[in-house]
């Protein structure tokens, strides 16, 4: 009798998990409207992107980080 109730309990737990997991994963995925601000922020980041020809190689102002001109 205990084996039958244990298997029924296992079946009930499995069915609950089977029904609850897909609903929680769908709600955690971003919808199409929620992904639009991400696109806007990536455009802002790309607007500050510098190509290799625009990178400043002169070093820091304080001189502590290295680079720049070295005084003998």
From Swiss-Prot:
Coiled coil: none annotated. One of its GO terms (cellular component) is apoplast. Its main location: membrane. The keyword Signal applies. Induction: Accumulates upon infection by generalist herbivores such as Spodoptera littoralis. Induced by wounding. Keywords: Apoplast, Cell membrane, Cleavage on pair of basic residues, Membrane, Secreted, Signal. One of its GO terms (molecular function) is receptor serine/threonine kinase binding. Interacts with MIK2 (via extracellular leucine-rich repeat domain); this interaction triggers the formation of complex between MIK2 and the BAK1/SERK3 and SERK4 coreceptors, and subsequent BAK1 activation by phosphorylation. Belongs to the serine rich endogenous peptide (SCOOP) phytocytokine family. This is Serine rich endogenous peptide 8.
